[in-house]
């Protein structure tokens, strides 16, 4: 007997006609839920609990919520309720590409479920009948998700520098290179204007510090090996890195090597790498094996990590 994975979300009031039509256009989309219970209320649906209109978005906090919550596919919309199908690991699913902005999917690709990086407004259906904003996540190709996170991290680092020393950062240049991403010939602007620098992306403060610490934790033996390979073996792969080895690396006293010290460095470095990977692995993921550009429907299987 097949396991019933249906989740029913009841509204507090019947939907208006335009709200009903807007939600029906989103059938096939992925929505987060606070838990996996069969019957839930509307307050548990969507990203409104971590991405409300009253607060500035903290995208890393939203990503952490997406990694812990229950995900489901919107299957049916009625005037008084929604029906969704819970997504379990390795499940085969049918979803649709009904997100704004629109990014083309294709077969044999990986999709990431991410916060609404480009516009909370465009990812929200306002249900005035229920006094509730239903905020949808984005489902985008994984390589685009990586590009977004990389640019947000650089933007945040330089914004912090500018807060302490405004003359040290060319904000026009920072805006040009970090607030826009290109994908398949089109350019999209990230929603960084509405973030509060005092709270938004606060987890990236730790991540930025982790990156700085990692640069100091690289075992000295690794640096010695790097310089030896670049200078002598001339392997094609090491030639790629020859031009980007910082000058300070060549000035380190590599003759003072210590195996116990390098073991400690390696152990701590792995600890910080695991902290970084918990953010940057872009879980959860959807592995698409069939996609129709005409119907925007995709067949995929689900991986929480």
Curated annotation (Swiss-Prot):
Secretion signal: which residues?
A: none
Task: Give GO terms: molecular function aspect only.
Answer: structural molecule activity
Q: Where in the cell is it found?
A: Virion; Host nucleus
InterPro entries xref list = Herpes_capsid_2
Check the record and name the Pfam families matching this protein.
Herpes_V23
**UniProt key word Glycosyltransferase:** no
Give a Gene Ontology cellular component term annotated to this protein: viral capsid
Coiled-coil residue windows: none
The answer to whether UniProt assigns keyword Coiled coil to this entry is no
- Give the chief site where it resides: virion
Q: Give the source's domain of life in one word.
A: Viruses
Q: Which UniProt keywords apply?
A: Capsid protein, Host nucleus, Virion
State the protein's purpose: Structural component of the T=16 icosahedral capsid. The capsid is composed of pentamers and hexamers of major capsid protein/MCP, which are linked together by heterotrimers called triplexes. These triplexes are formed by a single molecule of triplex protein 1/TRX1 and two copies of triplex protein 2/TRX2. Additionally, TRX1 is required for efficient transport of TRX2 to the nucleus, which is the site of capsid assembly.
**Family under the similarity heading:** Belongs to the herpesviridae TRX2 protein family.
Q: Quaternary arrangement and interactors, per the entry?
A: Interacts with TRX1 and major capisd protein/MCP.
HAMAP family tied to this protein: HSV_TRX2
- Mind telling me what this protein is named? Triplex capsid protein 2
